Swiss-Prot record:
This is Phospholipase D beta 2. It comes from Arabidopsis thaliana. The active site is at H444, K446, D451, H778, K780, D785. The gene is PLDBETA2. Hydrolyzes glycerol-phospholipids at the terminal phosphodiesteric bond to generate phosphatidic acids (PA). Plays an important role in various cellular processes, including phytohormone action, vesicular trafficking, secretion, cytoskeletal arrangement, meiosis, tumor promotion, pathogenesis, membrane deterioration and senescence. Can use phosphatidylserine or N-acylphosphatidylethanolamine as substrates. The keyword Metal-binding applies. C2 domain is a calcium-binding fold, and the binding promotes the protein association with membranes. In PLD beta, all the calcium-coordinating acidic amino acids are conserved. One of its GO terms (molecular function) is calcium ion binding.
Amino acid sequence: MENYGWNYPYYPYRPPRPNPPYPAPPHHHGSMSHSGPLDHHHPPMSYYASFDYQHQPPPPYPPVSYYASFSSHSDLSYSGRLDSSGHGFTSTASPHSPGMHIVPFGKASLKVLLLHGNLDIWVSCANNLPNLDLFHKTLGVVFGGMTNMIEGQLSKKITSDPYVSISVAGAVIGRTYVISNSENPVWQQHFYVPVAHHAAEVHFVVKDSDAVGSQLIGIVTIPVEQIYSGARIEGTYSIRDSNGKPCKPGATLSLSIQYTSMNKLSVYHSGVGAGPYYQGVPGTYFPLREGGSVTLYQDAHVPEGMLPGIKLGNGMCYEHGKCWHDMFHAICQARRLIYITGWSVWHNVRLVRDKEDPSSECRLGELLRSKSQEGVRVLLLVWDDPTSQNILGYMTDGVMGTHDEETRRFFKDSSVQVLLCPRNAGKRHSWVKQREVGTIYTHHQKNLIVDADAGGNRRKIVAFVGGLDLCDGRYDTPQHPLFRTLQTDHNGDYHNPTFTGNVSGCPREPWHDLHSKIDGPAAYDVLTNFEERWLKAAKPHRINKLKTSYDDALLRIDRIPDILRVLDAPTVSANDPEAWHVQIFRSIDSNSVKGFPKDPKYATSKNLVCGKNVLIDMSIHTAYVKAIRAAQHFIYIENQYFIGSSYDWNAHKDIGANNLIPMEIALKIADKIRAKERFAAYIVIPMWPEGVPTGAATQRILYWQHKTMQMMYGTIYNALVEAGLEDEYSPQDYLNFFCLGNREMVNGNNESGTGSASNENTPQGLCRKSRRFMIYVHSKGMVVDDEYVVIGSANINQRSMEGTRDTEIAMGAYQPQHTWARRQSGPRGQIYGYRMSLWAEHMALLDDCFVEPESLGCVRKVRTVAEENWEQFRSEEVSEMRGHLMKYPVEVDRKGKVRPLPGSEEFPDVGGNVVGSFLAIQENLTI
């Protein structure tokens, strides 16, 4: 299993804004620095007294009720104005002028309202903060090391290191950087934040950053009712302590906040849009690149004739890509560089497995060695699994079995350079945080970058991006065999982590994935990502400074005349029916890349977000939210995980799985129901997370997944009631979850290799007898309205979306000639062909209704096929399955209540509760 998670809140993007709504105060004491990992809504230090830091991490933040005593009915002192005529309180003086007068808001409202849109926030400054650091700075010196003493820091004035966290419904949506040693900090920091929260108040929590945690200084609350009209609230507020009293006489926070609802945000009203003015996803690190080419892949290989032909709108037939075949030939044809990033890279994997192809016996390691001997620069940037070791030649495989040490050893005496890259928290983080990040999180990107022929004796950059690692267990075709290829295509490549012990005669775990190839300017952004990561990972640290530096391994392509630069890269005219516009997104932070601004004040200029001691690119989350909000007809998702929007669950609201994606989908459907318009969401996930389904971690993930489903179906049911449609339609007429599975009969070749007796009452024995197993959905992709596609390495959970956990990369792309806005009807371009090809793979049929996925007829047809396949899968009778798409084994009643499917409370053969169990395991391992 690749993905567990720790429970940190998420941080949205903040596109730049030219000027703050009010001037900065004339004074500022203290130097600026950003420090520490992501913030967790820490209360005073006494709150943590009962926690053993060596055996469990501290809680992320207290529940919302923690703040109730000092946020709900406190008399909030306020000065300033509401930016709409006839509303609010005004001050004729500048918010910072000596003549400013304080006007109380009165009792704060507790009315809960839905904030669905964007918040435009400025946090300007604080004044007269209390000094909380005299005691805790001393502790920081003792526990944080003696370097401060060496540098003479103790001679400086010791006072608070303040920052501000902004939260809605208990979910942190933004935070300022830390300003060291200042009682009058000036941030002038802008936030442009997507929200999809039911909330009564917006909290601005002022904290003091310490080496051993954070202390609560005080809080300012803004009632949602005050901003719901869209008026801008702007002013200076008294900072209150936990008793509702000023934390210090004269302690204030200056801010402004404005809410814009979805119906006023035109960028979300017309999908991709038409014309030259569409700028892609705003507020991201990499821009939209026009005039590229994209190839979309399903599975590692699609043999000729395995899938039916699909007619496109231009009269052409959709061409099914052969991912690993194309990767193999791209490597073979490289002349200058081959760069690979991976969660896992195995030198012994075979990319080509067609019997008639002479390359079928070539191993990846041999190919890369051969290319490096030709003078090609071959660099591998692979996650360093901390549980694998190579000590004095003795290697341990590691818990994840990534082959990292094995692959490094294979290339040891070659010119191929392998850099094993641990997931580091950064030296300015606490020791606890460094251990936490290094042990739990991973480098999860999967890329291949090569130079390719550009004509005229010139070279260009081509990149492959998606979910497929170049390692064992990944090669598969749309047939997803269980037993029949164990002695052929999968000989020496058996992978099924569900089983422990003897696996003789057991089914392999079929692997379904999505990938892409990018040819054009956006490929250079993938190269930039590799270069930024390599330079950061290659930088020597501490004792490693004695080792060889990898800094000079990267090719300087600007000094190689025959490689075209990004501005010179060949492009396709936007009028060409096959043109693509492509944008690269990431989840990554400044601890994993070199090139982010050193001063957090400049984060906004790069569309980065501030965390404690870290700058964050979380543009994958931004891209998903933008695409879902802009969807007009349907959403099709395949993903390895589906967990999020925990702030709106019916329990465990505070675990920190705060990404917006599930809630945005549910609210999109609810909006369409109220508008009496059709909309459908299809979500394909694995039957269970990879591993043992009865295990504590797996059960906890399934439990969170169930909570996510329940929240979404509940939101949809409420919308049906509001529209008076609850008797006519059910929630599953709009949203459905599916999984994939296969079942094979024994053929005459006795391909199964029966092994030990098949009547043993173990998962192995039961699977040998039933000849069935799930197809593992490892995909990380989304299709919206057949006009926009997202494919990458990021799962839909907190660790992939947050930016400070796993490092991720994705591409978002569309064809400008194949959009709803241009055609005024359903697009029939490559994205349409890709989605139809995936459905043909999963259902073994192409129905006429599939061309309109939003239609009720299509939704019910797909659900019927999936229900029939599930019944065939769970039956005692062994039969050959043609289609693989199955109903996820839960029952959703007309009121949106989600329960295990009767008779299928546990997964067939392998056990484990379908809706999971709340077992005693740290939730930060599973979100």
